Amino acid sequence: MSDTELYREAEQRLWRHVGASPTERTVELSNGASVRVQELGDGPPFVLLHGGSICGTSWCTLAAALEGVRCILVDRPGCGLSDPIPDGPLRNLPAVKRHADGFLVDLLDALELDSTAVGSTSYGGYFAFRGTATAPERVSRIVEYSWLIGAPSDSVPLASRLAALPGTKDLMVRMPMSRWAVKEALRQFGLGRAMDAGTFDDEMIDWAHALMRHTDTLRNDVLSSPDVITPIRGQNTELLLTDALLSKLEMPVLFLWGADDPNGGEAVARAFAPRLPDAELVVIPEAEHAPWLDDLDTCVERTRQFLLGEDADV
């Protein structure tokens, strides 16, 4: 079997495991790159942008539970089964910013969506917020699931600190990722409690390992991702979202933020959310970086109420 077939086999096992069967299609961006999207459910569209070095299937448990919503799970360029970024990897922060500024609108054009709600997490939040600021009329609402790149950090996972060392990124993408290494990386970035509780279970770990082993997701995304921290100056302040940019996001924004997110927890959330014109913050106790894995019921209920109105049947 080819690498793509081996990856698809693991992905299909995961979807069966969560009891869902998404449809799949590819759309073409203006630069000619093909982007894979999976769709699940009926209702108003909800475009979901995943975090770093992962793909759209990372939303599987949330999407399977969001009744009344048409979830559109996107593999960002270079991730999952989407084409790499044309002329990538992106080697400097200005190039990353240009890519983030243009991707969301380009994607919505390809999806033929004039306006939609957007959900995001981590690196996906950087794309969601910067892209929305570029064309706010295209986004009706945003749900941000915990900390996003562009927000301040009050702590930095060990993997991020190591990645900031010169030459480390190139080394990381050359090393084979064992199942154990995948688990440890996920734990570092804030999925430890979900793994310990079994909400990120063996089928999900097998899928994540297959993604690292049988696709170029890790290489493509690591080499095109900005440094959240720098070896000398600490947090990369040039990456932070400015008040001027955030002021352009006048649509309702819901933050479902893990209180114990190792990238930036409750204190960061309470300082960051009020910087947006119309933001609601829900801090989820004992949740980490992927709050829908730690407390699915709360994330589903709050998301449906926010997208469908207070009368949503929860």
Question: Where would I find each of the regions flagged by the language model?
Answer:
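Flexible "cap/lid" loop of the alpha/beta hydrolase fold
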Residues: 142-175
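Conserved alpha/beta-hydrolase catalytic His-Asp/Glu region
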Residues: 153-157, 176-247
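Catalytic active-site module of serine/aspartate enzymes centered on a nucleophile-bearing elbow/loop
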Residues: 278-314
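Short beta-strand/loop motif that positions the catalytic acidic residue
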Residues: 249, 255-257
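Alpha/beta-hydrolase fold catalytic core
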Residues: 1-46, 67-69, 88, 113-114, ...
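Active-site loop/oxyanion-hole signature of alpha/beta-hydrolase fold enzymes
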Residues: 76-123
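Conserved HGGG/HGGXW glycine-rich cap/lid loop of the alpha/beta-hydrolase fold
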Residues: 33-84
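Acidic catalytic loop of the alpha/beta-hydrolase fold
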Residues: 260-264
